[in-house]
Amino acid sequence: ELLLSSVEKICSAPRVVIKAGGGSRKFYRELRKFAQQAGAAVVLSPGSTGVLADNDPLNMHVGGSKGSISGNFAMQNADLLIVIGSRAVCQSDCSGVGYPNVKEVININGDLGDLTHYNQTIGLHGDIGAILRQLNNAFPNSAEYLLPKQAWLQACLHKKVEWKSFLTKIQSTEGVYDEVWGENVLTQPAAIKVVCDFAKKHEAIKFFDAGDVQANGFQTVEDDLPGETYTETGASYMGFSTCAIISNGMADNPKYGMALTGDGSFMMNPQALISAVEHGAKGMIIIFDNRRMAAISSLQQAQYGVDFRTNDSVAVDYAKLASAVSGVHAFTVDGGAVALHKTLDQAYLSDGLSVLHVRVYAGTDERAGLGAYGSWNVGNWCDSVQDIYLSRNI
């Protein structure tokens, strides 16, 4: 009865959005079929990239507190929400205010707490794959019900094109003058794009650390399958990606890994270099050094117009630091995108573990990041976000 009721609501709703969380990754085949039959735009969480191919017209990319132009558009304008294996957290639903026009929710989840998070919910509790297969079999044979949904899907597709155009513009920035470095250096979005393209070319797994690298990372990646990227957005443990490289030396079927980390996150656990060499890991750690906690700096700038105590005056030569560990191949990247490409090639050909030190820009130049498109219940935004939350239907 709940399955049939869910299908009826999906077929009759003109603007359906699916929030695909980390719990949907193992069931991406069922999800792709379900999205087609539901006529739904699909919004990803930071940890679920790849459940839809990057160029799939239904893939609106990430949506949440950081989000994207297309992902947050779909969240803000949908009237029916289908949650699949997702938790209601800031980077997923904008601290509870990400769906202002949604009237009803269908929640497919294995966790009862997540299943019942929203009001006005039909809860489908159990194995996500089994539930999706049953729903897929329950849709009408005729596709006439999809016709009224086309205007919605076209509007979402227009926003996807807008997002991709914006990414291309920001990621092609050659260099911005940085006061700390005293010269033009790559922006983080431009540098991360180069590394992600390299990883895709060599079918390497990407591991993203917490902070600014993480945020720019999940907005950048162009995954076509789950497992191409792992990003620790659940708790944002600094040092996660560096430690993850160790797994290459311990896995039965190792795959080349590339850890993308900031200077602060790397320093949380440089001991991982020793463990990686000890276990024979083969991979690469790319340190994007902006001499500060840039994620917090940008949040302070947005809320107060000034950053406070998020940087230091101590320069660290991370290539020298890493090269002190025997078995580590360390590189300093001097220059722009071409130099980064060249160094990535050299590091990839090295046997064992490689570490790249990449200096990147930090500051208020709008090209330094990929933007924030949602709400966040933090700092001096709390009162307004909570007022909105209490007024929501769901």
Stretches with model-predicted labels:
Residues 157-252:
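Active-site diphosphate/adenylate-binding microenvironment
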Residues 22-24, 48-49, 86-89, 111-113, ...:
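Short glycine-rich anion-binding loops that position phosphate/pyrophosphate groups of nucleotides
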Residues 48-160, 285, 300, 344:
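Glycine-rich, acidic loop regions that bind phosphate or pyrophosphate groups
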Residues 65, 72, 77, 115-116, ...:
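Thiamine diphosphate
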Residues 33-39, 93-112, 226, 368-385:
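A short, gly/pro- and small-residue-rich
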Residues 2-16, 75-77, 194-202, 249-255, ...:
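Glycine-rich phosphate/diphosphate-binding loops that line cofactor/substrate pockets in enzymes
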Residues 1-9, 175-178, 381:
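Conformationally flexible catalytic loops at phosphate/diphosphate-handling active centers
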